[in-house]
Amino acid sequence: MTINPVSRKVAWLRVVTLAIAAFIFNTTEFVPVGLLSDIAESFHMQTAQVGIMLTIYAWVVAVMSLPFMLLTSQMERRKLLICLFVLFIASHVLSFLAWNFTVLVISRIGIAFAHAIFWSITASLAIRLAPAGKRAQALSLIATGTALAMVLGLPIGRVVGQYFGWRTTFFAIGMGALITLLCLIKLLPKLPSEHSGSLKSLPLLFRCPALMSLYVLTVVVVTAHYTAYSYIEPFVQNVAGLSANFATVLLLLLGGAGIIGSLVFGKLGNRHASSLVSIAIALLVVCLLLLLPAADSEAHLAILSIFWGIAIMVIGLGMQVKVLALAPDATDVAMALFSGIFNIGIGAGALVGNQVSLHWSMSAIGYIGAIPACAALVWAVLIFRKWPVTLEEQPH
């Protein structure tokens, strides 16, 4: 199915709008990390108790990514995007109105449903809508939108929450989604499904040991990162005893360092993806081990967060590149699985951080996170040695 030829300008506008949508969807997943203390205060709960909604959201996305992709595989893509945006916006209005924590969690589950469908179709849509010969650039634009969610979305969401209340943050995300939806309605042509959501490719993917090993690495390293990252805002305020404003600065630094990470990966990723990912995981181990010692000063935490941000961005980009390289004929299913597995890691990390904070001490989140990070480092070295060629990005 080819789309009627359009000007390059219109084609790029379509891809950019999708990238903005990716930014919005990822911002709403990450933004509660910066709002945990405020949400806890408004519902008279402990921060660690509120943190469970990070796990619920991530695991709903993880469990529903593949089923939703298959359920909607025959649906015309423009109509599907409109439907999932309506669900996304309505759920944000419910988040804004949430009269108790249960209602807030229900609204987040609605958002997670939309998120699960969105991420299982976005990569293939970007490729279809891209100007001729610009598929790789279209995919990197979507990745940039995703990366900017951590760089800008999360800190801006936190600033809005700090000054206008956390409800306003969710309302603003909903309004951003509404504007994006209107742009998509105007810009997108009819996009008949290309039946990309087929289970036939699943057995092939499961029979690829390099890919399965990569999925295991993903879940372990993401669990390590989110064990500490999910609770970084209350950690800065309650353990380090620093101000709410500094917590915002730290999130901005951590996200902003991701830009450096993506530049490093963009320059060296094609040839040295395995080495880069291994070095980044080693850097993550060091950052997690030093989190508590660094809490003695703002400068130490700031420096640590820069290295942490670089490491996690390189890891995320490296994993995506490798998954796409190992499953060139089943990118939709492979990426839906990757998204699901990534979210299992987010949920698991947030849950471990939650349990450590509730039953032990929030000061230990870095040390506990370093345990799976060390395991991930050993696993990465082993699998990159075993499959050195197939794990490198295929030439375009």
Swiss-Prot record:
Ranges that cross the membrane: 15-35, 50-70, 81-101, 103-123, 136-156, 169-189, 202-222, 246-266, 275-295, 301-321, 333-353, 364-384
Localization per record: Cell inner membrane
GO annotation, cellular component aspect: plasma membrane
Domain of life: Bacteria
Membrane protein topology class: Multi-pass membrane protein
Primary location recorded for the protein, binned into one broad class: membrane
Cell membrane recorded as keyword: yes
The family this protein is said to belong to: Belongs to the major facilitator superfamily. SotB (TC 2.A.1.2) family.
UniProt xrefs under PANTHER family: PURINE EFFLUX PUMP PBUE (PTHR43124), SUGAR EFFLUX TRANSPORTER (PTHR43124:SF4)
Function: Involved in the efflux of sugars. The physiological role may be the reduction of the intracellular concentration of toxic sugars or sugar metabolites.
Name of this chain's protein: Probable sugar efflux transporter
Gene source species: Salmonella paratyphi A (strain AKU_12601)
Organismal lineage: Bacteria, Pseudomonadati, Pseudomonadota, Gammaproteobacteria, Enterobacterales
